[in-house]
Amino acid sequence: MIIDTHAHLTDIKFDNDRKDVIERAFNSGLSRLIEVSCEMCYWYKSLELIKQNNIFASFGIHPIDVLKAVKSDYEKLETLIQNEKCVAVGEIGLDYHYDNCKNNIDAQKESLKVQLDLAKKYSKPVIIHCRDAYDDMIEFIKKQSFMPTGVIHCFSGSLEQAKIFVDLGFYLGIDGPITYKKSDILKEVVKNIEIGKLLVETDCPYLAPQKYKRTRNEPSYIIEIVKEIASIKNMSLNEIEKVTNQNALNLFKGIK
């Protein structure tokens, strides 16, 4: 059985067949999934989704949205984090891909700090989004007065950066790009980082595995990620499923 630790099933791309997608997911061998609700417009839609068995949530304010967020949004977020089926805070982090001006970076760091503090207050792990900002993220985390626990979602950094995050206590999220032909750096990371520090994620509807590339991704496709990791690490599918499943349970303690 596999746990998809990062899905966005409230996305509008699933509006026409969400029920079928969820049914396919659990029929394909998925045991649980985490709905990552990091866009404020989807928060309450996610609350409805997690009423279903074996679907849990993470709530946060995505770095791309921090300039739109106001004080009341953080107050709403704090309430959502206390939901019994909320197992993490996120995805939160730094994203310099679209806008790396100082004002935006400062706002992202301020928001990240607020949300890290909320995670600490309610003893939740964090799901970290990091794009074109790995060195800054490492520096930021090291400066915190406490060390958060969590996962670096959809890791795409170097092996050196991967080792630093693992040394800091983080897991690395491995997604569809591990199956792509031009993913040598990521394959090297997976080869050299112990399986006990890896999580499998789809990030659906984004980043479909090579077999389904250029189509909408969905949780049932997660087996393609597991297969690729097994091939890289010369391990059986069962071993990869068993260890990554336990990794998810160890990190997201609210999953039952």
Regions found by a protein language model. Give the residues of each.
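Mid-domain alpha/beta scaffold segments of enzyme catalytic cores
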Residues: 1-256
